[in-house]
Amino acid sequence: MITTHPLHPNDLEEDKFHDECGVFGVFGHKDAAAHTALGLHALQHRGQESAGIVSYDGTHFNAHRSLGLVGDNFSSEKVMERLPGEVAIGHNRYATTGETTLRNVQPLFAEFDFGGLAIGHNGNITNAHALRKVLVKRGCIFQSTLDTEIIVHQIAISQFSDVLDRMIDALNQIQGAYSLVAMTEDALIGLRDPLGVRPLVLGRIDRANILCSETCALDIIGAEYIRDVEPGEIVVVSAKGIRSIKPFNKKNKRFCIFEYIYFARPDSQVEGRNVYDVRKCIGAELAKESHVDADIIVPVPDSGVPAAIGYAEQSNINFELGITRNHYVGRTFIEPTDQIRHLGVRLKHNANRGYIEGKRVILVDDSIVRGTTSEKIVAMVRAAGAKEIHMRISSPPTTHSCYYGIDTPEPEQLLASRMDIDLMAKHIGVDSLAFISMRGLYRAIGETDRNPENPQYCDACFSGEYPIELTDRNGGPLPAQLSLLTEQV
């Protein structure tokens, strides 16, 4: 009998940052849940560990949550039939806080005195443990280990009567980066934190309105992009139309710069810029800053492709797909023996000897995190006969961890925090290594330079300058989280 077993991400040696979540909401469409499932499918790159949808049919809230990919869990008619109604919200998750268990699948749902509320959150609350400690002392019982549940409890204890006032009151207690969608019995609500670190856009299809993380999720259902939700803005969609509220003190925008480099899908429009175009511009700037004579430019697929194209166009060196990626390696594998695990990166990538042998190769990738993947890719390309290997990275050295909703290693695990560039080059086995400068990155995005007094983006993973207070991080060891549900579901 053939059996399948869980294949841990470490088995694939994927050394990348991971965004935590994607969110999607629909108001006023007869196929709200189906559109939400399609939207989540388009946002699958933002979270692959779990997905959930909650709908409202005018009388009842209905929910379906599952571990795994959207297509594996929301493609059947039976599932869609259990999610009736013209309003729905959905959520994809990659865990940065809390375990990957069914009880941690969003959207979360709770009954209040004003009615039901479902909520899905992309980001990270940086004072979650401090707030949780206070809430537990007040008698709150947590059903998950999600920081999102902090928001739910803060809404529950608010003394205001109106649901929006209660949400605003709750969010005034919260520090962190967040974009979220919520659903009540008569409204779809979307909002961004005052710095606008995480993305959220507004769209329309027929007479229905959409809120979602990226424009690629609008494209898949044929919806029209209307605009970005502004930092600190709450958008309320109801039968009365669309209402905008800006209840928070205005702050300088600090959108996550890594959305342009890696997280967002290349076909999305982010903050008014096409992501694919920005990545090509980054590659061109990288070529200007760190030219080296070579025979071919080879991207590390898939995330290195746009920057490699830009590098090739700027340097007039041939672009070749010298590495092929296997897109069908999932989260399970037939009998994952130690031998298979030791294959590591070769499960996903293979060098094309016919194009690499005897060539001076420039490898282009989006980032180096721990360096484990880069080291193995370089060894693979070297084994395919490359004469020289020069690596070019379309982001500055990643020297600091992210605490705003991105799954990153601790600083001591980041290669660039432990080594200078020459040592990194020796460690991963390349003839030369170069990263785009901070100035070059900002120029590629459309700025003249980085403003050191007031940076235009959140670039804390490169600069170490955190625009939102890290209350939990700076408060010492984090306490264990209290929950009645301690067993994994």
Describe each model-derived feature in a short phrase:
Residues 120, 183, 191-192, 203, ...:
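Generic beta-strand/beta-sheet core signal
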Residues 171, 186-187, 204, 222-228, ...:
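PRPP-dependent phosphoribosyltransferase catalytic core
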Residues 150-162, 301, 313-331:
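Amphipathic alpha-helical
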Residues 316-361, 371-372, 399-405:
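Short, glycine/charge-rich flexible loops or terminal/linker lids adjacent to PRPP-binding catalytic cores
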Residues 31-33, 96-97, 127, 197-198, ...:
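Flexible loop/turn segments at secondary-structure boundaries
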Residues 74, 144, 149, 319-330, ...:
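A conserved beta-strand->alpha-helix junction
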Residues 169, 216-217, 224-225, 229-233, ...:
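Phosphate/diphosphate-binding loops
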Residues 1-231, 236-294, 300, 388, ...:
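Conserved short alpha-helical segments that host acidic/polar catalytic motifs at enzyme active sites
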